[in-house]
Amino acid sequence: MESVAYILIFTLCIGTIFFAIAFREPPRFEKPKDK
């Protein structure tokens, strides 16, 4: 049953990082593309 808790925590971490990047400047690890 612990696997479910780990999946939930992992999802929350990914979501937090995703929103943090989304509301910040675009990622810089790739060359800037026209958009």
Curated annotation (Swiss-Prot):
SUPFAM superfamilies recorded: Photosystem II reaction center protein T, PsbT
Keyword terms of this UniProt record: Membrane, Photosynthesis, Photosystem II, Thylakoid, Transmembrane, Transmembrane helix
GO-annotated biological processes: photosynthesis
Topology term for the membrane: Single-pass membrane protein
Descriptive protein name: Photosystem II reaction center protein T
Major subcellular location class: membrane
Domain of life: Bacteria
Location of this chain's protein in the cell: Cellular thylakoid membrane
InterPro entries: PSII_PsbT, PSII_PsbT_sf
Organism: Nostoc punctiforme (strain ATCC 29133 / PCC 73102)
Keyword S-adenosyl-L-methionine tagged: no
Subunit architecture: PSII is composed of 1 copy each of membrane proteins PsbA, PsbB, PsbC, PsbD, PsbE, PsbF, PsbH, PsbI, PsbJ, PsbK, PsbL, PsbM, PsbT, PsbX, PsbY, PsbZ, Psb30/Ycf12, peripheral proteins PsbO, CyanoQ (PsbQ), PsbU, PsbV and a large number of cofactors. It forms dimeric complexes.
Transmembrane segments: 3-23
Gene Ontology cellular component list: photosystem II reaction center; plasma membrane-derived thylakoid membrane
Pfam family membership, one: PsbT
NCBIfam families tied to this protein: PRK11875.1
Family: Belongs to the PsbT family.
Functional note: Found at the monomer-monomer interface of the photosystem II (PS II) dimer, plays a role in assembly and dimerization of PSII. PSII is a light-driven water plastoquinone oxidoreductase, using light energy to abstract electrons from H(2)O, generating a proton gradient subsequently used for ATP formation.
